[in-house]
Amino acid sequence: DARTLYYIDSPTRSVQAFAFDLEHGTLGPPRVAIRFAEADGLPDGCTLDAEGHLWIAHWGAAKITRWDMGAGRLLHTIALPVRRVTSCAFGGPQRNHLFITTAMDEKSTAPEPEAGYIFRIDPGTTGPELACFAGG
């Protein structure tokens, strides 16, 4: 809706929301929109879908979650075969694929051979229309 900015604050395991004034480019004070338990890992990268729902990557918890931010409600969880999930973004000609990035190190490749892969899922929704930068 271009009126709310979401910020993932990994160290505090929270998502903060700021009212955003598009005309003036200013932010209101932050409020905690979601606070995660330790079992949820660290929230990391995120993206919005065309319905305005927030998709969040969970570092250390092997999952992506989808949230209704208006209601503050978890809608869906997608499990992944690797723990270090870093971010997600919609792509493809119709923006109907969700690409999920993961991380690896030498220790993670033996127990998790797919660590470091980019996964593609079709979540049944699309990404938002692309916003073009006017330049300047």
PLM feature spans:
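Surface loop/turn motifs at the tips and blade-to-blade linkers of beta-strand repeat domains
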Residues: 32-39, 77-81, 135
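Beta-rich catalytic cores
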Residues: 11, 29, 42, 60, ...
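Short loop/turn segments immediately following beta-strands, especially the blade-tip
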Residues: 18-26, 69-71, 122-128
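Beta-rich, blade/repeat-based domains predominating
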Residues: 1-5, 36-53, 82-97, 105
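Conserved beta-strand positions in repeat-built beta-propeller and related beta-rich domains
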Residues: 5-12, 54-59, 97-106, 111
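Structural signal for beta-propeller blades
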Residues: 13-16, 62-64, 106-108, 118
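Flexible "stalk/tail and boundary" regions
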Residues: 65-76, 90, 98
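Blade-level signature of beta-propeller repeat domains, shared across WD40, Kelch, NHL, RCC1
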Residues: 89-136
